[in-house]
Design a protein with these regions (language model features):
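Acidic/polar loop patches that form or flank catalytic/metal-binding clefts of enzymes
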Residues: 76, 81-85, 172-174, 217
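A flexible loop/linker signature enriched in serine peptidases of the S9 family
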Residues: 7-23, 34-47, 54-73, 84-94, ...
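Structural signal for short hydrophobic segments within the conserved structured cores
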Residues: 33, 83, 128, 173, ...
């Protein structure tokens, strides 16, 4: 590589700002160049495509709003232009990973209280869900052949274990079970997903965690966590 891309907050009073930008600098030294001027939010996580044409990155639209949606952007290193790949995708894109042909990306996104793997091609510009299940997937990596993905899978009952994901079907295979013996004799809670109407009519997803050996005829203390 001939250059390095990084995130920096080069603004007055950076401690009070979320306006970080992508910068590139030659590896041999030289002047740094801002790749995202005019983008006032939080730009982060740059990843070069294998062919060197693109830099994928995540960007928040609004300054000063740390919970804004992380949009998936592409920086064209030939034209210098930035473009949003998935403007209609209603979730934040995390852990951006290129396919080896530089024609698509894998990433993780939160949906209905879970974290799933998605993919999006540069040509199709649509997010396609790869995995399903009541879990959170993180630490995403793509195998050299592109046929498999690797990640850590956690759930509300289990800590992280390593899994392999079929990139086409989304089938998940557990590769480790370090905590299996410890959980073998445990009584685990019953967990159900529910939807509730908000005051504005929108639906809010929530998890209801019932104690082990739950008896619906009995009354239990209730704790609300938001």
């Amino acid at each position: 590589g001939k250059e390095l891309c990084y995130t920096a907050r080069r603004v007055p009073n950076p401690e009070a700002s979320t306006d970080s930008s992508l910068w590139v600098v030659p590896v041999g030294g030289g002047e740094a160049k801002n790749l995202t001027p005019g983008m006032p939010g939080y730009d982060q996580d740059p990843v070069y495509s294998p062919d060197g044409r693109w830099i994928a990155f995540a960007s928040m639209a609004r300054p000063g709003f740390e919970a804004d949606r992380l949009r998936l952007f592409l920086h064209d290193r030939q034209s210098g232009k930035n473009q949003e790949l998935l403007p209609d995708f209603d979730a934040g894109a995390h852990e951006l990973r290129w396919t080896k042909d530089s024609q698509a990306l894998f990433f993780t996104a939160e949906v209905e209280g879970t974290t799933q793997v998605y993919t999006a091609s540069l040509a199709g510009r649509q997010a396609v869900r790869v995995t399903n299940g009541r879990h959170a997937l993180s630490g995403l990596q793509v195998a050299p052949d592109g046929a498999s993905l690797f990640a850590l899978r956690t759930s509300m009952e289990r800590p992280a274990e390593v899994v392999r994901i079929d990139a086409k079907t989304g089938a998940i295979t557990a590769l480790t079970d370090h905590n299996g013996p410890a959980f073998a004799d445990l009584a685990l809670p019953q967990i159900d997903g529910e939807w509730f109407p908000a005051t504005d009519g929108k639906q809010i997803h929530a998890w209801i965690v019932k104690p082990p050996n739950f008896d619906p005829s009995k009354r239990y203390p209730f704790v609300l966590y938001c």
